[in-house]
């Protein structure tokens, strides 16, 4: 794949997450009874960064959970018995019933990953509401899903790929478009 353009560098990612944190606080009246749930892998790290910013602003910690939605994906081919992944589902260190859950992911594309994340959450409990925060929304939805908080809208063609790199995983903070 050939890199076409850098969309967000480290500073732009930091600014986008700070803005999203402020929007979350404003919409959720100080983040009382709110839990962030990051979708594995990069969504978890983004959720942790958002929680840190919210705590800096509000002075109160925010609970962060993890969603591993491998089992729930409808677009993954069946694995052989020897290659079954270890599936955790939702690992949220608090009761989600009657709480506001904010699902955090790096890129919103077709909406299938978010739908799978909501399926995993409903298996754990019944939140009062579910919101969605993404670093990048690239369009091309196949399901009626939209983000409540968006770092950057990046219209792309289906022949392009948006790749998010984060220090915690990739030793670099960067969002770029690649040609397939």
From Swiss-Prot:
UniProt keywords (A-Z) are: Glycosyltransferase, RNA-binding, Transcription, Transcription regulation, Transcription termination, Transferase
Q: Is Transcription regulation found in the keyword set?
A: yes
Classification via CDD domains? PRTases_typeI
* EC number(s) given by UniProt: 2.4.2.9
- A GO BP term, please? DNA-templated transcription termination
Against Pfam families, the record matches this protein to: Pribosyltran
Catalysed reaction per UniProt? UMP + diphosphate = 5-phospho-alpha-D-ribose 1-diphosphate + uracil
What is the designated name of this protein?
Bifunctional protein PyrR
Location of motif PRPP-binding in this chain is: 101-113
User: Its biological function?
Assistant: Regulates transcriptional attenuation of the pyrimidine nucleotide (pyr) operon by binding in a uridine-dependent manner to specific sites on pyr mRNA. This disrupts an antiterminator hairpin in the RNA and favors formation of a downstream transcription terminator, leading to a reduced expression of downstream genes.
GO terms assigned for molecular function: RNA binding; uracil phosphoribosyltransferase activity
Oligomeric and partner information? Homodimer and homohexamer; in equilibrium.
Any keyword Transcription? yes
Tell me the protein family, please.
Belongs to the purine/pyrimidine phosphoribosyltransferase family. PyrR subfamily.
Give the originating organism. Answer: Bacillus pumilus (strain SAFR-032)
């Amino acid at each position: 794949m050939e890199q076409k353009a850098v969309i967000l560098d480290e500073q732009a990612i930091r600014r986008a997450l700070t803005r999203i944190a402020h929007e979350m606080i404003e919409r959720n009246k100080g983040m009382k009874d709110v839990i962030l749930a990051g979708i594995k892998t990069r969504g978890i790290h983004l959720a942790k960064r958002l929680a840190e910013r919210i705590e800096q602003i509000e002075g109160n910690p925010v609970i962060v959970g993890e969603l591993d939605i491998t089992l729930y994906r409808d677009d993954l081919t069946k694995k052989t018995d020897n290659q079954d992944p270890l599936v955790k589902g939702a690992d949220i260190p608090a009761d989600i019933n009657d709480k506001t859950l904010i699902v955090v992911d790096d890129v919103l594309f077709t909406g299938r990953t978010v739908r799978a994340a909501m399926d995993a959450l409903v298996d754990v409990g019944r939140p009062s509401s579910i919101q969605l925060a993404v670093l990048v929304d690239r369009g091309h939805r196949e399901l009626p899903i939209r983000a409540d908080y968006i770092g950057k809208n990046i219209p792309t063609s289906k022949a392009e790929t948006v790749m998010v790199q984060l220090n915690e995983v990739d030793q670099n903070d960067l969002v770029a478009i690649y040609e397939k």
